Structures are given as structure tokens and as C-alpha cells.
């Protein structure tokens, strides 16, 4: 049997009404109708394959294919993050940098890093895990006293993308808030960074419900392994080639390489015309 060409659904219906099939032909025709109906149901109107559901996202990722000193593409756009009050960069087009540090423990570098920030008059944000407040209260107080933001990096550093219950999510943040209050005597700023960048869209919604701004990053490098620290030259090349307008820079407070290069990094960026702002200056 020679099968007719199938066009739009209306044409298919008209064709079927005029079609007088034999037994086998009827079976084939029914199969075609079913397959067409399924395709119409699952394909979006533009004919393109649908993207994976946002709830499936579990790791923050960046694509630097746009080239040197260009804002990388996040696996969730800043426009989409705006819906949840979250950021990975400042897309206003100004020559500004937001410097942030993550830490779960102290490795003897925080004092040197704070000294450089004080000397260069650069504001920063420190996203700390619960253990840091318990073991380094003096350093936490110094961060706050010198004008830096201390943000919430959770209490136990879990994979937050696996936490769907709001009460469990809240517990991870509230326990850190309590530790901050005990150490500083004040309320914790409402900035949150997911451990290891693991998250789901529901996590963004949960953080927003709790009054938090979720802060990802647009520039980082492999600096977290204390047994495999990058060389000074590698670190400077990697960071300088990828710095861009509105960058939110993530460095690890435990990195001896970061402590070594920070002053050179900051002065170099200042020479390029960059200014440094606190996270409170981020605007949607």
C-alpha cells in the first residue's frame, strides 16, 4: 500500500475521512493516527525538543566558550535566577567585582587574606560552614568588625539538592544563624551559597521563602584541594583571563595559593579599572 503524505493534523483528519481501507490498511492507518497524536502531545509548539526540567539541575556549572574576559554562561541564566532572587553575576555592564570566599575550616590563611583586604580597602563576603563559627569565633568577629559580610554556607555542608522538605532546609540555615548570633551578637546577613554548588530549583524557592539571596559565582578555579595547590602562575593566569564585568569571584579561604596571590590579584584588577563592591550592592 502506498501511504499518503501526512501534513498538519487538520489535513490528516480530512484525509482519514475519505480513506476506505482494507483490513491491513486500517491497522496501519490506526497506527499512524496514534503515533501522530503522541508526537503532537509531547513536542512543544516550536517543534524543538524540550529542555530537561529545571528541578533536575543539581550542580552549578559555567561555560566559558564566549571567550577571554567575557561573562560565562551559567546552566541557569541570570534572567531565570532573578525569579528566585538569586545571582551568579551582576549583569548591569559595570566594571565591578564581588569578591567572595568559602570555608568550612581554618587552614592558617584567613589572617593574611584579611590583612590584604584591609590594606587594599576591598569588601568581601565569607560563606562559612557551622564548624568555622565553633572553632574560629575570633576570626568571624574580625571579618564582621572590618566590614565584611559573613554569609550562610549551611551547618553541615550537605548536598542541598537532595533536601526537598522546607523544614530540613530551614534547619541547615537556622543552626548557622544561631552560631553567628552567638559569636557576633547580631543577626546574620541573608546571603546563602549552596555547598559545592549543588542545588535544585525548589532549593532556590526555599531560600527565597526564608528571605535569603542565593549567591552562585561566575569565576572560580580548582583551589580547594590543600594537597594539590595550583602554582601562583597558574592561578593568576586562570583568574586574570576570565575576570569580567560584574564578576562574582569564588575563592577558598583555605588556599595558601590564594593567600599568596591575593594582593597582586586585587592591585592588577584595580589597574584594569575594576572597583570592588559588597554583595549588598547586587540589584535585580
Regions found by a protein language model. Give the residues of each.
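N-terminal pre-catalytic segment of deacetylase/amide-hydrolase enzymes
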Residues: 2-100, 106-114, 119, 265-268, ...
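Metal-dependent polysaccharide deacetylase catalytic core of the NodB/CE4 family, i.e.
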Residues: 94-97, 107-109, 118-250
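Short acidic donor-binding/metal-coordinating loop in glycosyltransferase active sites
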Residues: 101-103, 253-254
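Catalytic grooves of carbohydrate-active enzymes
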Residues: 243-280
Amino acid at each position: 500500500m502506498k501511504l499518503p503524505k501526512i501534513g498538519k493534523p487538520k489535513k490528516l483528519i480530512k484525509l482519514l475521512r475519505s480513506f476506505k481501507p482494507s483490513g491491513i490498511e486500517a491497522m496501519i492507518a490506526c497506527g499512524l493516527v496514534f503515533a501522530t497524536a503522541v508526537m503532537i502531545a509531547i513536542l512543544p509548539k516550536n517543534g524543538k525538543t524540550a529542555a530537561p526540567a529545571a528541578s533536575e539541575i543539581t550542580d552549578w556549572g559555567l561555560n566559558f566558550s564566549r571567550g577571554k574576559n567575557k561573562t560565562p554562561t551559567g546552566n541557569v541564566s541570570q534572567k531565570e535566577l532573578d525569579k528566585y532572587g538569586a545571582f551568579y553575576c551582576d549583569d548591569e555592564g559595570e566594571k565591578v567585582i564581588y569578591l567572595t570566599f568559602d570555608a568550612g575550616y581554618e587552614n592558617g590563611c584567613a589572617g593574611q587574606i584579611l590583612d590584604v583586604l584591609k590594606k587594599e580597602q576591598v569588601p568581601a563576603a565569607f560563606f562559612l560552614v557551622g564548624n568555622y563559627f565553633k572553632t574560629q569565633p575570633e576570626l568571624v568577629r574580625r571579618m564582621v568588625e572590618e566590614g565584611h559580610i559573613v554569609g550562610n554556607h549551611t551547618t553541615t555542608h550537605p548536598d542541598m539538592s537532595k533536601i526537598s522538605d522546607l523544614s530540613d532546609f530551614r534547619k541547615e540555615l537556622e543552626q548557622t544563624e544561631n552560631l553567628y548570633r552567638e559569636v557576633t551578637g547580631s543577626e546574620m546577613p541573608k546571603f546563602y551559597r549552596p555547598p559545592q554548588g549543588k542545588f535544585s530549583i525548589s532549593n532556590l524557592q526555599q531560600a527565597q521563602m526564608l528571605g535569603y539571596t542565593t549567591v552562585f559565582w561566575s569565576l572560580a578555579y580548582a583551589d580547594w584541594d590543600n594537597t594539590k595547590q595550583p602554582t601562583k602562575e597558574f592561578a593568576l593566569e586562570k583568574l586574570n583571563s576570565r575576570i569580567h564585568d560584574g564578576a562574582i569571584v569564588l575563592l577558598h579561604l583555605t588556599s595558601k595559593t590564594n593567600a599568596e596571590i591575593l594582593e597582586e590579584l586585587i592591585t592588577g584588577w584595580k589597574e584594569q579599572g575594576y572597583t570592588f563592591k559588597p554583595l549588598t550592592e547586587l540589584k535585580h
